[in-house]
Amino acid sequence: MRGSIIMFAVVGLAGVSAQPVPAQAPAAVVADPPVDPKFPPGVTGITVPSHGVDMDATLYLAGGAGPHGTVLLLHGLPGYEHNGDLAQAIRRVGWNVLLFHYRGTWGTAGQFSLSSAIEDTADAVRFLRDPATAAKYRMDRERVVVIGHSFGGFLAGYEASHDPDIKAVGIIAAVNLGKINADPKEKEERLKRWEAQLHPIRGATAPGLFSEAERHAKEWDYVHWADALRGRQVLLVEADDQNHTDMEALAAALREKGTIALDHEAVSTDHSFSDHRIALQTIVVKWLEKLNAHGVADKH
């Protein structure tokens, strides 16, 4: 039987708040946990298979015997902000963390496309569901959380809307690929930015990626995923960036559909949350603790 999968992106508590800085950060954000000498935390380089390519990945192993839940941390395009600080905070609260690079990015073999990254995400989820993976790394294959930022947030939402085993999904400042061609002025601004940032990408150009998105405009508009997500726990966080309007539209659509559990927070910061990193870690850790309280508990 396939394990239940929980996809998760950084969010705050119920409702929308412009300043989600808590009065006190959780211990996992500000202090190291006690060390289990028999099962200390660790980090290892691994590969994740996808369509004949071994994708480069880093696995942060939580301390303690486990089995531990695992967070799949999806970066953006190309992903200059890898959110490594989030990985460390998440590990301190007792979860493993897997970061990987899509085919054709950051030295991973293959050619990049938006569609191939969708495939890579699904393959990474399958990897974490694999009993052999779970046994080797002391993972609980029924407790997998996916955190997605920017393009990674789009991927998290797409995977959740197409996989009925995903019980919860969250999205951080996600680009809406279905709408990036809709407004000529915004398209020009975004296109220039992408052209300047694709050095780590193999096999793709910014105009080519925009053309690919245009061919999939309807199916890649994440506002249209609201109905598929209505029975899940949905978690959203937005920033003061070019994706703000689409994130608001997704939140409105989810409310209209009567989503069973929607948590939505707005952070007054840039796309990378550059001046709110501690706040972001706090939100992530508190949300994981909230998931634990709802039955997705980690076994320390």
Question: What name fits each language-model region?
Answer:
Residues 90-109:
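Conserved alpha/beta-hydrolase
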Residues 77-89:
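The serine-hydrolase catalytic nucleophile loop
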Residues 67-76:
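Short beta-strand element of the alpha/beta-hydrolase
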Residues 24-65:
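N-terminal cap/lid segment of alpha/beta-hydrolase-fold proteins
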Residues 112-136:
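Alpha/beta-hydrolase active-site loop
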Residues 27, 158-209:
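Hydrolase active-site cap/lid region
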Residues 136-150:
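Alpha/beta-hydrolase fold nucleophile elbow
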Residues 209-283, 287-289:
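Serine-hydrolase catalytic core
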